[in-house]
Amino acid sequence: MARNKPLARKLRLAAAYKENRPVPIWVSVKTRLKVRRGFRLRHWRRTKLKV
């Protein structure tokens, strides 16, 4: 990817970076481990962003 990115692309990449994190611990505790894993987790090599 280019070093100099347009601002819109940079903002979209930043948003995708922020939302790609696991479920908080308190959610697992509150739901008694019914929610263990975020279904929207994305691996950088398996699934590419449409940016």
Curated annotation (Swiss-Prot):
<dbReference type="GO" id="GO:0005840">
    <property type="term" value="C:ribosome"/>
</dbReference>
<dbReference type="InterPro" id="IPR023626">
    <property type="entry name" value="Ribosomal_eL39_dom_sf"/>
</dbReference>
<protein>
    <recommendedName>
        <fullName>Large ribosomal subunit protein eL39</fullName>
    </recommendedName>
</protein>
<keyword id="KW-0687">Ribonucleoprotein</keyword>
<keyword id="KW-0689">Ribosomal protein</keyword>
<comment type="similarity">
    <text>Belongs to the eukaryotic ribosomal protein eL39 family.</text>
</comment>
<dbReference type="Pfam" id="PF00832">
    <property type="entry name" value="Ribosomal_L39"/>
</dbReference>
<dbReference type="GO" id="GO:0003735">
    <property type="term" value="F:structural constituent of ribosome"/>
</dbReference>
<dbReference type="InterPro" id="IPR000077">
    <property type="entry name" value="Ribosomal_eL39"/>
</dbReference>
<dbReference type="GO" id="GO:0006412">
    <property type="term" value="P:translation"/>
</dbReference>
<dbReference type="GO" id="GO:1990904">
    <property type="term" value="C:ribonucleoprotein complex"/>
</dbReference>
